[in-house]
Amino acid sequence: MRVTKGNDHLKVKAVAGTRVVLLAFDMDEGSREGLLGFAVKRGVKGHEQTWLRGTKYFRDLVPHPHPKDDYSSREQPFQTFLWSDYKAFADTDYDFTIVALYGDIHAFEERHTLEFSIRTEAEDDQHHGVWFNRGAIASHAFETKFHNKRLTEEMTDNVSDDGKLLDPETEWLSRGLAEACLKYINETGPGEGLRVCAYEFTYLPILRALKRALDRGVDVQIVYHDTKKDDDANRAAIGKAELPDKVVHGGQETQVLFRRTRTPIPHNKFIVKLVGGKPKRVWTGSTNFTDTGFFGQTNVGHLVTDADTAKIYLDYWAELSGDPTHSIALKNATGLTPNPPNVIAKKSIAAFFSPRIADNMLDWYGQRITDTTTLAMMTIPFNVAKTILAALGKKRDAMRLVVLEDVPAAEVTAAEKANRGKLAFSNGAILGKSFIKYKVGGAKVVPIANSDLDEWFVEEELARPTNNGHVFFIHSKVLLIDPLSDDPLICSGSANFSTNSLTSNDENMLLIRGNTRVADIYMTEVDRIFRHFRSRDIINHIAEEGEHNKWLELDTTGAWIGPNFKEGNYKNNRRQLFFPEADVGTWSDQAAADPNPFADEKERAAAKKKKKPPQG
């Protein structure tokens, strides 16, 4: 939901997702002098409002701060023109009061007060359900709330049969994601069906929920990745959950488990639900069925209630259940989901399955980035593909904000510098520490030497083990095009934005056009993740240079305001996203005139085939 409110001096644009309410402010030039910040008050509709809190303070008012302390925004205002409330609940009506504070910090003067109401989105409106986990496992909040408690298998597996997470740490990290997946399985009744396609399939509460579904008469069939190794983790978990290879219902034997062995990365993570023998819903997204998927790295679960979409996924599942060779899998994926047009139909959902003969879909994504008129946002778990970087790096008026798993490569940093103020990257980070990955998997965490960060901030730690794995922070695969417009494009699913993902793996993506509710949820969440890591990237970089800073002290001089209204500045460009001076249209206006990105698909595939070394 979106709300705009204003007077002659102050404007606010509020965007509500499910668990985030984003607030953007704009101030008339004549009212900026002497502005000390904004106080924000919020309450459930019809109930008392309370001042929201932050961690920054005026030194004169807080001479002896503690890193764990927070402060009322009425006493220590927010000195920013973009602020988000991360403690909202889904499907709830809220009243907000925004007050601009001026004068003496010992006796603030309130001016230009604005009041408005907004409703957060329901997690599932019976068309699209969207759940993002916390995705910020190393954070100020996790330390102050749970003292950086290390996650254990006992904690993550502590789940009731009805799908409630009984451990407070895992419940906080899940943020409804694991619960939604468990509920989806648990609500399936006798005679209904579930078709599971799983890459990593080791989170026992999910497997046990599927076993209980079998026991109550649900037709459960599972395609899972089998490496054929003796210590295969999926097979071990299946054994622990006592999921049978076959079952007998009404005297008829039915296969339950189907091994996927003929591709190195069968990367899907979806579950189709059948009612009355017909596909009705599909759970998909980026979340592997693992404890790390639900409680560690950033992930999204996306539930679509649409018979046509569910049918396409069911047909895909049926093809994969036969463990096809690469050539057959490629033919099946292309047959089920032909290459999309540059402009998919209004108010539509299109699926896109892999493998494909070539990586031209990267060109399609790149064109959509270039077509963006206001804002493009991405989450990229691995390297930035050259095609994607070329699109991101083009000189454009639109802003481009990208969250990476790893520290940007030199060419990524160069693109950012060439588009300063318009293109910005953030990457997975732990405040005050360097995170060094090993190529074979795992990582080591090293404190930044000679920094004073421990005087200002609590110590953040990654609550999951670092001795194995390749993705610790960002695992979602999301592309948002003009998400603040009335015609947004949302791309989300299992597929990394890479050549291998397109040409080698089993993958699925959803392309969703024109759904502003879904766009608001995704935008507020990707913005949350982007800003969480960007602040840590910046602070760590400055600390590594040996600089010291008064990190949490508020400004009494008014200098904080200037960058928000300086032409070309990142903060000014960000503010203007919410208060545009003119209507610039949307991505679809330009996309219709773009060339066909798949025109050379066969030639590209043939060239790739020639480059392959001879076998044997």
Go through each PLM region and give its residues:
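Short, compositionally biased low-complexity segments enriched in polar/charged residues
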Residues: 172-187, 202
